[in-house]
């Protein structure tokens, strides 16, 4: 059986960039979410660490993405959101309300139309895991949570297994001064763990831009990669790896 795979567009924090990633061959996107309660919209899609710092409301992003998917024949198989900032002490006291309002927007402006599409919510620090637990009342069978930086597969497994939640694991770097291959041992550990536990559903890495890095992680058995070179990774999968890997579709549930 071929391995279902997710090419995840890197920082598609505008609908235009998201659609470009999908047209280039991605089947997943992971925009950044910031919570700014001082504004009426509260949830915004942008990242302070990227060049594109324009604040776009989550509402407008979801409406635009939904409309674009309706107009274009694109294969979006997974919608992931990287939740930032993680959890300050002030933030923790609002986390229940945060998740309630977050899912209200997700369901009203997107999942009311695309309910079959899998959803993944991630945080980039171990301290963010309690926030993800607050999402539990709203998660459905094709939705899960995960940690994508600064943790270990075993710690993530222990935490979310206790909470009876399906989860994903990732690690990597976008730094020009460090190779994602530095994280190969911990990703290998996660892939091995996935083979032995039902709860760990998805293992991926970031940001894989060179063919060497892509091949290393494809051979390792990951389920996906975040990349800024979508067409390069897609070509590699469609040629050298087409016998063992196939692109997931919206009908596939990685969290089943």
Where are the language model's segments positioned?
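Phosphate-group recognition and catalysis centered on beta-loop-alpha active-site segments
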Residues: 1-256
């Amino acid at each position: 059986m071929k391995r279902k795979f997710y090419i995840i567009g890197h920082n598609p924090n505008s609908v235009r960039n998201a659609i470009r990633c999908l047209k280039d061959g991605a089947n997943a996107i992971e925009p950044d979410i910031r919570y700014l309660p001082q504004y009426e919209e509260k949830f915004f899609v942008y990242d302070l660490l990227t060049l594109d710092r324009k604040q776009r409301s989550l509402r407008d992003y979801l409406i635009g993405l939904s409309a674009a998917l309706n107009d274009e024949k694109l294969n979006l198989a997974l919608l992931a959101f990287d939740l930032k900032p993680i959890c300050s002490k002030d933030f923790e006291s609002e986390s229940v309300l945060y998740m309630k309002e977050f899912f209200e927007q997700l369901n009203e402006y997107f999942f009311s139309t695309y309910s079959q599409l899998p959803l993944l919510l991630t945080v980039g620090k171990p301290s963010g895991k309690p926030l993800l637990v607050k999402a539990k009342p709203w998660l459905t069978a094709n939705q899960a949570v995960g940690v994508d930086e600064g943790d270990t597969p075993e710690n993530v497994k222990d935490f979310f297994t206790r909470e009876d939640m399906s989860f994903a694991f990732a690690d990597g770097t976008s730094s020009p001064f460090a190779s994602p291959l530095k994280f190969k041992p911990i990703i290998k550990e996660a892939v091995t763990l996935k083979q032995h536990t039902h709860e760990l559903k998805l293992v991926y890495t970031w940001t894989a831009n060179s063919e060497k890095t892509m091949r290393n992680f494809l051979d390792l058995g990951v389920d996906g990669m975040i990349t800024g070179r979508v067409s390069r990774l897609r070509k590699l999968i469609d040629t050298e790896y087409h016998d063992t890997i196939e692109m997931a579709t919206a009908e596939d549930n990685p969290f089943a």
